[in-house]
């Protein structure tokens, strides 16, 4: 009597699927743990991977040290943005933000602590949340994205306390002016808007594309990245990457780079930017290109500077984008190695 042979899953099918996933992966977001020793990276499949920076940077590091210590499914769609508080990792996807305890994640217990959805205009609306911003002085979180509004959430109660309206198209990016309670937002409508949190109103608008020296009509008017340092702001996207004096709404430096930039940050006396192309660009405030440091991804979407004082040995710049890798720069001048999903 012959026994029926059970249908077997072809050997290697799971590995082929994982290889295809990695091939088509985009890493949208990063966040460093409060202790500074771990890095969270969120991808287009809704996964968050946790890497041990301390293990990867160790003199005894092996290839395995550059792989995630844990990977978990966080959202049904892409993980567009992440930030960390002193205890929590906050992640945003389509229509909602979730909270996770760092202590539990590191024990590999990846159950969400809570989830919140901003009060959208209709129950059918599920807009992406492109940007998260912590406002430490008021213990709040600002969310912005596809519904063209900035929503403020009280981190203690989990309630949404205000919605700021003014953008006419979806919002890409947020930045905080720490010395004054003001938030900047940049969007697809080509405007950077400044909001005074004390009065919950828009107090300044800069329509970047209307300034001839910044305008690049062939790239569009969208603002994809911005950063602020007291009276100064740098922003880019469709228009050229430009340094602005905020009080006078004046563009002071237009940086000579053709590729649209997707992330920008101030660092010491430099401006770091990245976007289309594999390089992290180091700019003097005068507009001079000090360095272009190549990475392993064909396009970059996120830069993260780990400056946690608790872990000076993990002080690195990490860059991610259109690949399954997170490049690690141990000094700003070269890529030391890459972490990989």
Swiss-Prot record:
WD repeats lie at residues 22-61, 74-112, 124-163, 166-205, 215-254, 256-293, 295-339. SMART domains: WD40. One of its GO terms (biological process) is mRNA processing. The keyword Phosphoprotein applies. GO terms for cellular component: chromosome, telomeric region; nuclear speck; nucleus; THO complex; THO complex part of transcription export complex; transcription export complex. GO terms for molecular function: RNA binding. InterPro entries: THOC6 (IPR042626), WD40/YVTN_repeat-like_dom_sf (IPR015943), WD40_repeat_CS (IPR019775), WD40_repeat_dom_sf (IPR036322), WD40_rpt (IPR001680). Pfam families: WD40. Keywords: Apoptosis, Developmental protein, mRNA processing, mRNA splicing, mRNA transport, Nucleus, Phosphoprotein, Repeat, RNA-binding, Transport, WD repeat. It is found in: Nucleus; Nucleus speckle. Belongs to the WD repeat THOC6 family. Component of the THO subcomplex, which is composed of THOC1, THOC2, THOC3, THOC5, THOC6 and THOC7. The THO subcomplex interacts with DDX39B to form the THO-DDX39B complex which multimerizes into a 28-subunit tetrameric assembly. Component of the transcription/export (TREX) complex at least composed of ALYREF/THOC4, DDX39B, SARNP/CIP29, CHTOP and the THO subcomplex; in the complex interacts with THOC5; together with THOC5 and THOC7, plays a key structural role in the oligomerization of the THO-DDX39B complex. TREX seems to have a dynamic structure involving ATP-dependent remodeling. Component of the THO subcomplex of the TREX complex which is thought to couple mRNA transcription, processing and nuclear export, and which specifically associates with spliced mRNA and not with unspliced pre-mRNA. Plays a key structural role in the oligomerization of the THO-DDX39B complex. This is THO complex subunit 6 homolog. It comes from Rattus norvegicus.
């Amino acid at each position: 009597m012959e026994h029926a042979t059970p249908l077997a899953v072809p050997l290697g099918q799971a590995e082929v699927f994982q290889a295809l996933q990695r091939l088509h992966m985009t890493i949208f977001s990063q966040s460093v743990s409060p202790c500074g020793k771990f890095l969270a990276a969120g991808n287009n499949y809704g996964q968050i991977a946790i890497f041990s920076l301390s293990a990867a940077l160790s003199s005894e590091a092996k290839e395995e040290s550059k792989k995630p210590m844990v990977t978990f499914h966080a959202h049904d769609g892409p993980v567009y943005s992440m930030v960390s508080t002193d205890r929590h990792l906050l992640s945003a996807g389509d229509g909602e933000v979730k909270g996770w305890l760092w202590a539990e994640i590191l024990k590999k217990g990846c159950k969400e602590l809570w989830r919140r959805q901003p009060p959208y205009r209709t129950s059918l609306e599920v807009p992406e949340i492109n940007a998260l911003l912590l406002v430490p002085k008021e213990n709040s979180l600002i969310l912005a994205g596809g519904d063209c509004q900035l929503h403020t959430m009280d981190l203690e109660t989990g309630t949404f306390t205000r919605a700021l309206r003014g953008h006419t198209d979806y919002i890409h990016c947020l930045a905080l002016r720490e010395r004054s309670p003001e938030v900047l937002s940049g969007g697809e409508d080509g405007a950077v808007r400044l909001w005074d949190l004390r009065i919950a109103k828009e107090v300044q608008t800069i329509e970047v594309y209307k300034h001839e020296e910044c305008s690049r009509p062939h790239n569009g008017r969208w603002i994809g990245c911005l950063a602020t340092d007291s009276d100064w702001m740098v922003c880019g996207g469709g228009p050229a990457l430009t340094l602005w004096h905020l009080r006078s709404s004046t563009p002071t430096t237009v940086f000579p780079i053709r590729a649209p930039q997707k992330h920008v940050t101030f660092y010491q006396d430099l401006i770091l930017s990245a976007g289309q192309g594999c390089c992290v660009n180091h700019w003097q405030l005068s507009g001079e290109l000090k360095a272009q440091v190549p990475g392993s991804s064909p396009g970059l979407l996120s830069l993260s500077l780990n400056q946690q004082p608790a872990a000076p040995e993990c002080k690195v710049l990490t860059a991610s984008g259109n690949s399954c890798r997170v490049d690690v720069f141990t000094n700003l001048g070269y890529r030391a190695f890459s972490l990989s999903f």
